[in-house]
Swiss-Prot record:
PROSITE patterns: CYTOCHROME_B5_1, CYTOCHROME_B5_2. Its main location: endoplasmic reticulum. Belongs to the cytochrome b5 family. It is found in: Endoplasmic reticulum membrane; Microsome membrane. This is Cytochrome b5. It comes from Borago officinalis (Bourrache). Keywords: Electron transport, Endoplasmic reticulum, Heme, Iron, Membrane, Metal-binding, Microsome, Transmembrane, Transmembrane helix, Transport. Gene3D superfamilies: Cytochrome b5-like heme/steroid binding domain (3.10.120.10).
Length: 132
């Protein structure tokens, strides 16, 4: 286990001459790797000063890329210094909306009533023609 760093300490290392990242609670000095990174140094620099675990995992790095992290390890992060993420929960929607049901019935009637009238007119016309 290495030295314990706070988020503020790690955040100071945020340029191309001194770049540290936090991934899975560990701190890595990736300054020497900036030029070799396949995505370019901008990708790594944009992940400084925060927990970059999600950014790292979302890319889907290979097992060899994950193994490379060991050579850049400098310590661990003090988890109490990382602000907790607030998870967004959408507001609950009612499963049944009586207002929408009323609108549906009105639209259904607006469609069916003319059809019934048309069917009645055709039926009357057909009935009166065949009896004459």
């Amino acid at each position: 286990m290495g030295k314990i760093f706070t988020l503020a300490e790690v955040a100071q290392h945020n340029n191309s001459k001194d770049c540290w990242l936090i991934i899975n609670g560990k701190v890595y000095d990736v300054t020497k790797f900036l030029e070799d990174h396949p995505g370019g140094d901008d990708v790594l620099l944009s992940a400084t000063g925060k927990d970059a675990t999600d950014d790292f995992e979302d890319i889907g790095h290979s097992s060899s890329a994950k193994a490379m992290l060991d050579e850049y390890y400098v310590g661990d992060i003090d988890s109490s210094s990382i602000p907790s993420q607030v998870k967004y929960t959408p507001p609950k929607q009612p499963l049944y909306n009586p207002d929408k049901t009323r609108e549906f019935v009105i639209k259904l009637l607006q469609f069916l009533v003319p059809l019934v009238i048309l069917a009645g007119a055709i039926g009357i016309r057909f009935y009166t023609k065949s009896s004459a």
